């Protein structure tokens, strides 16, 4: 329970038609009523709008407003909430806020409204974090994932798993505490092993879908790599339909990263055009090449660009070897020049690399770009997304807790194989139960809660 009343501007600060100032706290209606000229807000019914005026200290009119009243417990925060719709000028909005703060009301911290909603039981931690995800969504799929969290689909996943674990713990504890009762179902190691295996499969399925959702939400970090002058920058520009990167016949034009985002049928490619890798004496170009090599370790996808109009060069072969253990797609650029030099030399280079593995494209006329996008979608299993696929996690914190729970079950499997005493099994089950509970905010440390909500906007 909170005893102070808070206020903040909820709309972006700028010139517009309307700005909204949100006030929350058990005394919010009483306090705002002191500076309001119009019908008595204390007598207003919940979820109603009242027209009137905000008054200055000298009782002159500051602004004409519409005030929405939401009474506890049926409000966003669970407290009495007042939302003041003022005119949308920067100065007038600030003046209305200052007038509100002259009362027994303080400025809210970032995310404090959502934090109060969580602490007052109006939402769980997944829903609170989904609000942030919705605000910061950069593509349509990210919005769908966030809405799934708000509708508690992911919370229900956690609740179902925890119910199964709790039931198993209860069976074990009853058998330990009351072994003499014949009417209690006997729990055997075989039965525990079957239950644990089922839970592991469920967690692995959740993780598989959640990793996919992370790509849908955050995008795929995609490194465009190749020797100089194979058309890496042209490829980036073709993706974006604009001249983002400098294109030149002079080798080594790109010396640092050029980053851009491309919406590929609902999900985001975080494209990074890199310095061409080759032997060079240019100190600045050397730095760019070293940074490119380091970026390989961080990339989720590598687009290795080769020149289809030319035979394989020594640098091409080095890059093929360097990236063979990374997630990559090999692109044969400049297909518009209608040359098969690259294909013929590939056959000589390696029997393991076939022409079918090369996606032939033209950055000039965009030939092959549809096939390239399809290949990327298939590689990350994003080519057949169904509505139910959004009902999984995408937040790194949630995925980490799922992994902790999974490791606890894997430890339990080892204990079962060693036929350890039955009371030992409850330890790993409890660890998994607690790890999943932290996803929805159960038994969370105050420091973590504060950190999570501090990332929210002011007024949210």
Curated annotation (Swiss-Prot):
SUPFAM superfamilies: P-loop containing nucleoside triphosphate hydrolases (SSF52540). K(+) binds at residues 229, 248, 250, 253. The keyword Hydrolase applies. Its main location: cytoplasm. Mg(2+) binds at residues 233, 254. One of its GO terms (molecular function) is GTP binding. Its EC number is 3.6.-.-. It is found in: Cytoplasm. PROSITE patterns: G_TRME. It comes from the Bacteria. Homodimer. Heterotetramer of two MnmE and two MnmG subunits. This is tRNA modification GTPase MnmE. It comes from Aster yellows witches'-broom phytoplasma (strain AYWB).
């Amino acid at each position: 329970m909170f005893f102070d009343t808070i206020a903040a501007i909820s709309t972006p600060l700028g010139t517009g038609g309307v700005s909204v100032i949100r006030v929350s706290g058990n005394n919010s209606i009483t306090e705002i009523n002191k500076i309001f000229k119009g019908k008595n807000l204390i007598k207003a019914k919940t979820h109603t709008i009242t027209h009137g005026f905000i008054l200055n200290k000298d009782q002159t009119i500051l602004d004409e407003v519409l005030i929405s009243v939401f009474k506890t417990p049926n409000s966003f925060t669970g407290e009495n909430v007042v939302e003041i719709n003022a005119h949308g000028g920067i100065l007038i909005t600030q003046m209305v806020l200052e007038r509100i703060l002259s009362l027994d009301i303080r400025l809210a911290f970032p995310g404090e409204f959502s934090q109060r909603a969580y602490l007052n039981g109006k939402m769980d931690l997944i829903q609170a974090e989904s609000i942030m995800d919705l605000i910061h969504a950069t593509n349509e799929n990210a919005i769908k994932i966030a809405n799934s969290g708000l509708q508690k689909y992911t919370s229900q996943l956690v609740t179902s798993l925890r119910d199964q674990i709790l039931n198993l713990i209860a069976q074990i504890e009853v058998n330990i505490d009351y072994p003499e009762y014949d009417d209690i179902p006997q729990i055997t190691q075989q039965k525990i092993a079957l239950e644990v295996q089922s839970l592991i499969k469920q967690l692995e399925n959740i993780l598989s879908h959640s990793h996919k959702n992370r790509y849908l939400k955050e995008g795929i970090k995609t490194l465009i790599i190749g020797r100089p002058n194979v058309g890496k920058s042209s490829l980036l520009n073709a993706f974006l339909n604009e001249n983002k990167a400098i294109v030149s016949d002079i080798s080594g034009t790109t010396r640092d990263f050029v980053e851009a985002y491309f919406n590929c049928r609902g999900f985001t490619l975080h494209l990074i055009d890199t310095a061409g890798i080759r032997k060079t004496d240019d100190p600045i170009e050397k730095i760019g090449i070293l940074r490119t090599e380091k970026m390989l370790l961080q990339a989720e996808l590598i687009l290795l660009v080769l020149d289809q109009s030319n035979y394989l060069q020594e640098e091409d072969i080095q890059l093929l070897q360097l990236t063979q253990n990374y997630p990559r797609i090999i692109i044969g650029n400049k297909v518009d020049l209608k040359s098969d030099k690259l294909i013929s030399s590939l056959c000589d280079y390696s029997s393991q690399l076939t022409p079918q593995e090369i996606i032939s494209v033209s950055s000039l006329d965009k030939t092959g770009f549809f096939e390239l996008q399809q290949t990327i979608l298939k590689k990350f299993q994003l080519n057949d997304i169904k509505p139910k696929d959004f009902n999984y996690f995408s937040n790194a914190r949630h995925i980490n807790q799922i992994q902790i729970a999974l490791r606890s079950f894997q430890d339990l499997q080892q204990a079962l194989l060693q036929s350890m005493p039955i009371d030992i099994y409850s330890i790993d089950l409890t660890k998994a139960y607690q790890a999943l509970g932290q996803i929805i905010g159960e038994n969370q440390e105050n420091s973590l809660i504060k950190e999570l909500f501090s990332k929210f906007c002011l007024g949210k």
